[in-house]
């Protein structure tokens, strides 16, 4: 394992390159190493950079990747918005399977999972505001510790941002474009200085409707109904967001995707019908929320009780992840079985 700033990366990575005249090279596995790039590479000046998050885990002693096709199709959707060439999904997944099987530094067991980071950037060396004709695509992987038991991740507090804007409909804020994350850092710093863990973003026009929490989608439980902001062109279409919607429906809960005004959440809390709030993302799956502050309104929550909907969803997801429940949704791709078939 390569240790960089407390992140332990595997010994190998995946690489392929693109030129507009010849298209994509074949994806190859090579040693994990620093990347050499020209000072005039367009990614450094005009922002053509995109990344995605994926995760793999132990499933009945087999090595499984969670929704790899969904994640890479989402990655391609981001690339299209940034006028970058889409990647060939099947060859990339096949090469990823090879990497996970041959890299002895990846210690996958019931005590950890594997974080997979595909990323792509423009490499053409020229100055001038135009799209690049050359790109580099890589995948790096690292081991991450698993929760010690089936308990939820620690609850977080949210500060509702009133001045700064994360995204508006029509821009690239709904994608995994690097700049859409960098633009959130100032608000994140200000929220932390006020004693909060993260920022709850409102829409960029009226600053009235709830959108998302930085790199997470958000859900509310009101009168035993689960509600989440509908995708509107400025909210990231998180893979875990869709996963939890499907899980909730399967558990018999009603899920509504709609515009949610922050004032309606404050009112629901005042009326005693807001019981839980949770966020979703690839790395943590579900993170409960214990406090939201909007102007002079403070909402205190207990979203991580054992009987909570948040806990039920987390357990249902973890049971599929660890093989305790059958994967009736066909979400996981079993690496070892595929490797045996191909052999």
Predicted feature locations:
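Charged, gly/pro-rich active-site loop segments
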Residues: 99-111
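Helix-start/capping segments and mature chain N-termini
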Residues: 1-99, 119, 126-343
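Extended, Lys/Arg-enriched charged tracts that mediate electrostatic binding to polyanionic substrates
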Residues: 109-121
């Amino acid at each position: 394992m390569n240790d960089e700033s407390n992140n332990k990366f595997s010994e190998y990575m995946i690489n392929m390159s693109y030129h507009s005249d010849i298209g994509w090279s074949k994806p190859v596995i090579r040693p994990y190493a620093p990347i050499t790039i020209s000072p005039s590479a367009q990614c450094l000046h005009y922002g053509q950079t995109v990344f995605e998050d994926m995760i793999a885990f132990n499933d009945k002693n087999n090595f499984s990747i969670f929704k790899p096709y969904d994640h890479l199709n989402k990655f391609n959707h981001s690339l299209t918005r940034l006028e970058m060439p889409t990647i060939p999904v099947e060859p990339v997944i096949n090469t990823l399977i090879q990497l996970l099987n041959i890299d002895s530094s990846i210690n996958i067991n019931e005590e950890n999972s594997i974080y997979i980071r595909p990323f792509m950037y423009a490499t053409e060396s020229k100055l001038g505001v135009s799209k690049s004709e050359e790109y580099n695509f890589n995948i790096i992987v690292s081991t991450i510790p698993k929760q010690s038991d089936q308990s939820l991740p620690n609850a977080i507090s949210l500060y509702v941002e009133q001045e700064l804007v994360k995204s508006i409909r029509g821009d690239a804020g709904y994608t995994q474009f690097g700049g859409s994350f960098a633009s959130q850092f100032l608000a994140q710093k200000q929220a932390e200085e006020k004693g909060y863990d993260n920022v709850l973003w409102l829409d960029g026009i009226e600053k009235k409707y709830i959108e998302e929490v930085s790199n997470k989608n958000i859900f509310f439980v009101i009168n035993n109904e689960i509600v989440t902001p509908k995708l509107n062109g400025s909210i990231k279409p998180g893979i875990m967001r869709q996963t939890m919607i499907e899980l909730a429906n399967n558990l018999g809960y009603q899920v509504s995707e709609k515009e949610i005004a922050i004032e309606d959440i404050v009112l629901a809390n005042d009326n005693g019908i807001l019981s839980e709030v949770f966020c979703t993302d690839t790395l943590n799956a579900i993170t409960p929320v214990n406090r939201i502050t909007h102007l002079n309104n403070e909402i205190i929550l207990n979203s991580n009780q054992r009987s909570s909907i948040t806990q039920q969803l987390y357990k249902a997801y973890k049971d599929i992840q660890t093989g305790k429940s059958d994967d009736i949704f066909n979400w996981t791709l079993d690496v070892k079985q595929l490797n045996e078939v191909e052999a």
